[in-house]
């Protein structure tokens, strides 16, 4: 009886017990409601195969897919004074920073790296919206300036992926100062006659739009990205008029001449490499590398997903 109670019954219960399924195995498409397996989404660079909806992607994942074979050398971000204003809203700013750093494993929202795309050496800088909404503060400003300095020192182009809600209110004027400081870095880049390409991702707003995000030589946007200075509701309340449908979307801005092109994330690497070769008068790549480091798992097309 003890053998049945202590061994057989627990064994049967463990077999029959329903296995718990992790919450993140299936991702829901916000536009169509379609459920997509998370592995398929990772391979497809977080672009929904059927609808083409571009979900947010982490800075590390973006760089992995962007650089040749997923290989790059991260740049160490400069150290800055933490919470110089001793700011507090619902919680202390320094505690808010600690929470984000513990959750995401990064110091701030900027990740810069050196590597190659189709053999071309470049510096890439990515803003991660997951860290305090990609807000521009002293740390992110210093990191962006260092990326420009590195590109100039190595005589190579810089590609910046913007994703931000604007200036970081917890740092006040110190945050706003990063707008002219990054603008000066861009002028130094232009004086060095080096290309600076901006990729506007969802969302790019506020002080970031009013500074380095709109000062590139070429402006590319991902499909469906929200791009603007103030939000639609603020503008409507100010001008007392109804805004056009799709106002501040990347497609609307392209139609009205505010950006140069709208490019799918799946085609971004090849497009930027082609543009850089034209600008820098480099010969075309003989064997362009796969945009994904996993050559055995190419991005899913709409037909394959169906």
UniProtKB/Swiss-Prot annotation:
Q: What class of enzyme is it?
A: transferase
Which keywords appear in this protein's UniProt record, sorted alphabetically? ATP-binding, Cytoplasm, Fatty acid biosynthesis, Fatty acid metabolism, Lipid biosynthesis, Lipid metabolism, Nucleotide-binding, Transferase
Annotated GO molecular function terms are:
acetyl-CoA carboxylase activity; ATP binding; carboxyl- or carbamoyltransferase activity
Name the chemical reaction catalysed here.
N(6)-carboxybiotinyl-L-lysyl-[protein] + acetyl-CoA = N(6)-biotinyl-L-lysyl-[protein] + malonyl-CoA
Superkingdom of origin organism: Bacteria
What is any one GO biological process for this UniProt entry? malonyl-CoA biosynthetic process
- Matches recorded under InterPro entries: AcCoA_carboxyl_beta (IPR034733), Acetyl_CoA_COase_Trfase_b_su (IPR000438), ClpP/crotonase-like_dom_sf (IPR029045), COA_CT_N (IPR011762)
Localisation? Cytoplasm
Q: Which residues form the CoA carboxyltransferase N-terminal domain?
A: 25-294
Which pathway does this chain act in?
Answer: Lipid metabolism; malonyl-CoA biosynthesis; malonyl-CoA from acetyl-CoA: step 1/1
Q: Return the Gene3D superfamilies for the record.
A: 2-enoyl-CoA Hydratase, Chain A, domain 1 (3.90.226.10)
Pfam families linked:
Carboxyl_trans
Instruction: Output compositional bias ranges, type Polar residues.
Output: 287-299
Q: Which GO terms describe its cellular component?
A: acetate CoA-transferase complex
So what EC number does this one have? 2.1.3.15
Region of interest (Disordered), residue spans? 286-306
Major place of localization?
Answer: cytoplasm
What quaternary arrangement does the UniProt entry report? Acetyl-CoA carboxylase is a heterohexamer composed of biotin carboxyl carrier protein (AccB), biotin carboxylase (AccC) and two subunits each of ACCase subunit alpha (AccA) and ACCase subunit beta (AccD).
Q: Which NCBIfam families match?
A: accD
Q: Name the job this protein performs.
A: Component of the acetyl coenzyme A carboxylase (ACC) complex. Biotin carboxylase (BC) catalyzes the carboxylation of biotin on its carrier protein (BCCP) and then the CO(2) group is transferred by the transcarboxylase to acetyl-CoA to form malonyl-CoA.
Spell out the family assignment given in the record's similarity comment.
Belongs to the AccD/PCCB family.
Q: What is this protein called?
A: Acetyl-coenzyme A carboxylase carboxyl transferase subunit beta
């Amino acid at each position: 009886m003890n053998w049945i109670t202590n061994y057989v019954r627990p064994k049967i219960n463990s077999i029959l017990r329903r296995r718990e399924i992790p919450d993140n195995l299936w991702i829901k498409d916000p536009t169509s409601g379609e459920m997509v397996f998370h592995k398929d989404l990772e391979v497809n660079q977080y672009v929904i195969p059927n609808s083409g909806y571009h979900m947010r992607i982490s800075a590390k994942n973006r760089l992995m897919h962007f650089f040749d074979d997923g290989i790059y050398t991260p740049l160490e971000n400069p150290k800055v004074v933490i919470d110089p204003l001793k700011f507090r809203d619902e919680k202390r700013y320094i505690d808010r920073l600690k929470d984000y750093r513990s959750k995401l494993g990064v110091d701030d929202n900027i990740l810069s790296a050196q590597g190659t795309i189709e053999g071309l050496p470049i510096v890439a800088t990515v803003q991660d919206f997951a860290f305090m909404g990609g807000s521009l503060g002293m740390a992110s400003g210093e990191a962006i300036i260092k990326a420009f300095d590195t590109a100039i020192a190595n005589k190579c182009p810089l590609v910046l992926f913007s994703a931000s809600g604007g200036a970081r209110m917890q740092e006040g004027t110190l945050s706003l100062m990063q707008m002219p400081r990054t603008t000066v870095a861009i002028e130094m880049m232009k004086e060095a006659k080096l290309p600076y390409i901006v990729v506007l991702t969802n969302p790019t707003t506020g002080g970031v739009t009013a500074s380095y995000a709109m000062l590139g030589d070429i402006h590319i946007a991902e499909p469906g990205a929200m791009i603007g200075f103030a939000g639609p509701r603020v503008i409507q309340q100010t001008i007392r008029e109804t805004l056009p449908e799709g106002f501040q979307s990347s497609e609307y801005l392209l139609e009205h001449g505010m950006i140069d092109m709208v490019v799918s994330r799946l085609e971004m690497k090849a497009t930027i490499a082609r543009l850089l070769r034209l600008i820098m008068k480099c010969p075309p790549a003989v064997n362009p590398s796969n945009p994904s480091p996993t050559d055995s798992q190419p991005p899913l097309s709409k037909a394959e997903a169906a």
